[in-house]
């Protein structure tokens, strides 16, 4: 039996419904005024935790176009990690890192009742603010600033007055990959989604806020903006079974820590260098996005490295912020992350169930939240080809910050199991209604659970992927497989041709093969002398757009030179160089550069015993 608590919000007369009004998103030509009524449905035995300000699930009822709609909301428990932190800098350059309380946050995902294709991303911090999709149309909702009133404005995205400006586009250009495999039509995507679910992946994200944005907004407004944007990006990636978790935010309060210029390419290159040599050493994460107010050349609104996810210098992106148009900024960020995950710009034959798709090279006047059939195809290819380790391992239950939500198929602290909703659950060990184990069951989820029993101690639950990885074994006490580990950095591998680095064995031969094919090998030592020149092609690193030559002892940590043995193309000193992706083709961190030495994140050849 359910108890239904109906909170009726007093109505106020608002005389300007339907006319033009200036709202947070800009000048809106047509809108409705609504008064959401909150409907809280709790099980009879449920008790709301007194210290919890924001409920885990909520429902609101209001009218759109004269028809009642019920908005179901569920707190986005993936939004923050357990160790979420914020870093700021004082005028003298000292960094201060804090860990604000984020468990009881007010950011939700949702859906509209009786609309199977609906979705929503909502902030409930002060009224309802965000967007929802209803009957194929994208609507925005926000509170009206009227004293003692619960009035909200609801309007279609298309009714925001457009700025008179040149078309905005993505700065990624090397997106001409085509496959011989047939691309599924949009109508086929729904039919096959249940059969071909994407493997669940987890991206731990850091947002870096440049000095222009820090000066533009106060601290609270900047935080709210970032949370709303990441909440929406998280929602956009749900159909691909990707979960984004915010690990931290870094604010460049006093000055930019790189040279942010109107050249998007140079800024991206500098940001990648900084992330690989600085941020990655301080903060564990998978990807970093620079949030900037710089107006880039060529109407560029974002740029990133294709296939760059999990790579020290390439798992980054640049996103231009668009004032209070958080939905637009979120779509740009999702687009750039899509490139990091192997997605190319949509080609002519690419379609989705919308007028445009996320990976369009030019941002539509009505930005879409949908990936095309081509993007789905590209992402599958990326997972198969690159097998990006950093995003394939789920966070441990203790690392999830938000309270558990029964029925979301994520086994969280406080739950004995979670197999989804009662309608979808196929697990005989778990009671879907309560997330409790069925009588006689020892476990219901986890890699160390089999036929409702915990596997015996010593049973392998995660096999070693290669010689630098280690297998994980069940403890006999828990159904959860221990955290993924690997051999210590610096352990010899590949017959002493390399040293282990973060679970991989990076050697130059494999990197040459990746760039130029199976016939490629490492070039003669004389080729690497080019890296001492600090030339257009040969250098060790870049600082504020200037190419720094390698010191003599570091030449094998700069640009990689290979011997291409393919027929008709025997170049003794071949290297990979693209103006728009200068990190690709550099020797990877952790690579052996001499006996007993490896390349560190600063592209220096250092003793393996002191490198880590």
UniProtKB/Swiss-Prot annotation:
Kindly state which reaction or reactions the protein catalyses: Specifically activates several components of the blood clotting system, including coagulation factor X, coagulation factor IX and protein C by cleavage of Arg-|-Xaa bonds. Has no action on insulin B chain
Disintegrin domain segment(s) = 403-489
What species does this protein belong to? Macrovipera lebetinus
Name this polypeptide is given: Coagulation factor X-activating enzyme heavy chain
Post-translational modification here is noted as: N-glycosylated. Contains 8.0% of hexoses, 2.5% of hexosamines and 2.5% of sialic acids.
User: Which UniProt keywords are given for this protein, alphabetically ordered?
Assistant: Blood coagulation cascade activating toxin, Calcium, Disulfide bond, Glycoprotein, Hemostasis impairing toxin, Hydrolase, Metal-binding, Metalloprotease, Protease, Secreted, Signal, Toxin, Zinc, Zymogen
Where do the record's glycosylation annotations fall on this chain?
A: 259, 353, 373
| GO terms for MF | metal ion binding; metalloendopeptidase activity; toxin activity
Record-listed E.C. numbers: 3.4.24.58
Q: Where is this motif: D/ECD-tripeptide?
A: 467-469
């Amino acid at each position: 039996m359910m108890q239904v608590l109906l909170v009726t919000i007093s109505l106020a007369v608002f005389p300007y419904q339907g006319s033009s009004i200036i709202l947070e998103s800009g000048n809106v030509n047509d809108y409705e005024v609504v008064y959401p009524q909150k409907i809280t449905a709790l099980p009879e035995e449920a008790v709301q935790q007194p210290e919890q300000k924001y409920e885990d699930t909520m429902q609101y009822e209001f009218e759109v176009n004269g028809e009642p709609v019920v908005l179901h909301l569920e707190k986005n428990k993936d939004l923050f990690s357990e160790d979420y932190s914020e870093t700021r800098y004082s005028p003298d350059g000292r960094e201060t890192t804090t860990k604000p309380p984020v468990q009881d946050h007010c950011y939700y995902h949702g859906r509209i009742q009786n609309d199977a294709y609906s979705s929503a991303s909502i902030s409930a911090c002060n009224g309802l603010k965000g967007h929802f999709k209803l009957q194929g149309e994208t609507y925005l909702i926000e509170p009206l600033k009227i004293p003692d009133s619960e009035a909200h404005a609801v309007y279609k995205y298309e009714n925001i007055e457009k700025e008179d400006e040149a078309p905005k586009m993505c700065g990624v250009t090397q997106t001409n990959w085509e496959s011989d495999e047939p691309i599924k039509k949009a109508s086929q995507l729904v039919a096959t989604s249940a059969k071909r679910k994407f493997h669940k992946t987890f991206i731990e994200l850091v947002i870096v806020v440049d000095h222009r944005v820090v000066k533009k907004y106060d601290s609270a407004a900047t935080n709210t903006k970032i949370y709303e944007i990441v909440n929406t990006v998280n929602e956009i990636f749900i159909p691909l079974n990707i979960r984004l978790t915010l690990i931290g935010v870094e604010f460049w309060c006093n000055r930019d820590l790189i040279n942010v210029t109107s050249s998007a390419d140079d800024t991206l290159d500098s940001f990648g260098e900084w992330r690989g040599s600085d941020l990655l050493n301080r903060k564990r994460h998978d990807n970093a996005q620079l949030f900037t107010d710089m107006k880039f050349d060529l109407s560029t609104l974002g740029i990133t490295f294709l296939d760059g996810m999990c790579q020290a210098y390439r798992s980054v992106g640049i996103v231009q912020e668009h004032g209070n148009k958080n939905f637009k900024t979120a779509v740009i960020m999702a687009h750039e992350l899509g490139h990091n995950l192997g997605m190319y710009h949509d080609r002519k034959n690419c379609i989705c169930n919308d007028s445009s798709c996320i990976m369009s090279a030019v941002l539509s006047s009505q930005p879409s939240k949908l990936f095309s059939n081509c993007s789905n195809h590209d992402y599958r290819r990326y997972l198969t080809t690159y097998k990006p380790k950093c995003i394939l391992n789920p966070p441990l239950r203790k690392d999830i910050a938000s309270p558990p939500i029964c029925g979301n198929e994520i086994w969280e602290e406080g739950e004995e199991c979670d197999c989804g909703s009662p309608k979808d659950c196929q697990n005989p060990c778990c009671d879907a209604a309560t997330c409790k184990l069925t009588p006689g069951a020892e476990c219901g989820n986890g890699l160390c659970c089999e036929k409702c029993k915990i596997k015996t101690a010593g049973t392998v639950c995660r096999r070693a992927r290669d010689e630098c990885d280690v297998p994980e074994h069940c403890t006999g006490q828990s159904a959860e497989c221990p955290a993924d580990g690997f051999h210590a950095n610096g352990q010899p591998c590949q017959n002493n041709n390399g040293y282990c680095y973060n679970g991989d064995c990076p050697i130059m031969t494999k990197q040459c093969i990746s760039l130029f094919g199976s016939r490629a090998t490492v070039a003669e030592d004389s080729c690497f002398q080019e890296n001492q020149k600090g030339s257009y092609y040969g250098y060790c690193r870049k600082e504020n757009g200037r190419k720094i030559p390698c010191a003599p002892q570091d030449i094998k940590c700069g640009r990689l030179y290979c011997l291409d043995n393919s027929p008709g193309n025997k170049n003794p000193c071949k290297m990979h160089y693209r103006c728009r992706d200068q990190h690709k083709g550099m020797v990877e961190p952790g690579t052996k550069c001499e006996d007993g030495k490896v390349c560190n994140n600063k592209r220096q050849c250092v003793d393996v015993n002191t490198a880590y």
